[in-house]
């Protein structure tokens, strides 16, 4: 019998009061942390896999077991999907999720000939910087980035571990400003939205609808928890 997923427990009320200061600090400074060798190698594997591709590329960041990467590959058959996660243990489960097939009318996962998706083990702090530096000369373009249920680090003292309050956020936005983030902690998305605003990026937040696309989302919705999504506006779009 599976245990009920825990709801977010936090000692933080609302958007962190230091968020603006933190985001602005990283906007005005350079992220100088050395890039790990294993992520450089993973990035080269991505380049090799894409080969002479000249179309859209979608990054599924924090992809976990890669179920969402497979869903994205089905939703965007004319794009190449790159799933990135730091955990080898999670990525080892990818083959299982890619093999699974169901006939549910609202959640059909048929794995016939899905060749436009691959997952890689890498540190996103480094991977985003490598993509940002390479993208100016790349034949392909990052058309969208997805962060589905990233670790929310809900303790107030952990704010700078959240992606939008980390030094990697600048590189993330350099890769692509078309972003979708999902979480079962609304405050996480409200903070992400505020960080985007500080970079002049507009976004909106709404409840998640439709079939679950990750194991976490499935567990949350089945236990009655509300899930939320943030999406940025396309350039020139208003809502």
Predicted regions and their residues:
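Class I S-adenosyl-L-methionine
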Residues: 188-195, 199-239
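Conserved beta-strand/loop positions that form the S-adenosyl-L-methionine
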Residues: 61, 84
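Class I SAM-dependent methyltransferase "Motif I" SAM/SAH-binding loop
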Residues: 62-66
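Conserved SAM/SAH-binding beta-strand->alpha-helix loop
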Residues: 87
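Conserved SAM-binding loop
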Residues: 94
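S-adenosyl-L-methionine
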Residues: 1-57, 67-75, 98-138
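Charged helix-capping and loop-helix junction motifs
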Residues: 160-168
């Amino acid at each position: 019998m599976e245990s009920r997923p825990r709801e977010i427990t936090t000692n933080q009320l609302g958007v962190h009061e230091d968020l603006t200061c933190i985001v602005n600090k990283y906007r005005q400074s350079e992220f100088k942390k050395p890039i790990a060798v294993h992520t450089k190698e993973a990035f080269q594997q991505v380049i090799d896999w894409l080969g002479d591709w000249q179309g859209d590329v979608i990054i599924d960041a924090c992809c976990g077991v890669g179920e969402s990467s497979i869903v994205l590959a089905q939703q965007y058959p004319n794009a190449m999907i790159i799933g990135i996660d730091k955990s080898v243990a999670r990525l080892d489960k990818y083959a299982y999720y890619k093999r699974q097939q169901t006939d549910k009318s609202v959640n059909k996962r048929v794995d016939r000939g899905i060749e436009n998706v691959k997952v890689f083990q890498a540190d996103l702090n480094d991977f985003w910087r490598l993509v940002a530096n390479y993208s100016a000369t790349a034949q392909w373009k990052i058309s969208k980035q997805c962060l589905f249920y990233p670790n929310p680090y809900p303790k107030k003292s952990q704010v700078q571990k959240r992606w939008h309050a980390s030094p990697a956020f600048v590189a993330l936005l350099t890769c692509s400003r078309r972003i979708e983030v999902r979480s079962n902690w609304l405050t996480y998305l409200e903070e992400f939205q505020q960080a985007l605003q500080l970079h002049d990026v507009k976004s909106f937040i709404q409840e998640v609808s439709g079939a679950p696309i990750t194991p976490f989302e499935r567990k949350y919705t089945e236990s009655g928890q509300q899930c939320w999504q943030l999406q940025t506006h396309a350039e020139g779009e208003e809502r």
